[in-house]
């Protein structure tokens, strides 16, 4: 049994309401892969693609490039991002914003990452680097929006793509979407690191314990966590206000339900 089937059966047993299949969201209908079709780009292939991009950008510096790719202990993704920084001041700015997101949370996806005219290799991997920084900084909304705008198969590290997407979806209480991302991480990426698959399973098991009732206190607590997180990031705008309205509404409904139960038992 593939992990896809196992998680589907487990999801149904846990009452996640995913049915007998896990179709991808409409935005991901193109370029779908199945069981083990995706892999991290090898260092040699990653270096070749990065070199071609840097030369096309007209910023190729052999010594600087070789220094980046001589670091065998550094991931292909990180060496790719370092190459982007050599060839694009805009990429350097975007990555710095992602790294600094815990201090100053970005409030929108950078324009370069939304520009479909950009080279797909450059845009997808820069988006992944930016989103990874945002996930680490707990800026989940923009992290998810960034990843939704690109395809995993255009990245040099599809496992990182699905992992950080699942983390953001889990944090934003998008249970079905998070399950789909975990399925693709474990089932579709042949060389997904153990740390990603292990954490993916932990996330899945956590969601299996979520209650269906929106008025359940644990579900309300998750909304409160998101509200508190956004306020701590100085993001008290409409999205935060909408979350707070949901909290008040669900607490009010819970109180009414408890009052009705008390009357019925009187």
Where are these regions (language model features)?
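General helical structural elements
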Residues: 8-9, 169
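N-terminal secretory signal peptides that target proteins for export/translocation
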Residues: 1-5
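Bacterial N-terminal signal peptides
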Residues: 9-19
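Sec/Tat signal peptide C-region and signal peptidase I cleavage site
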Residues: 18-27
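Mature extracytoplasmic or organellar-lumen-exposed domains after removal of signal/transit peptides
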Residues: 26-160, 164-266
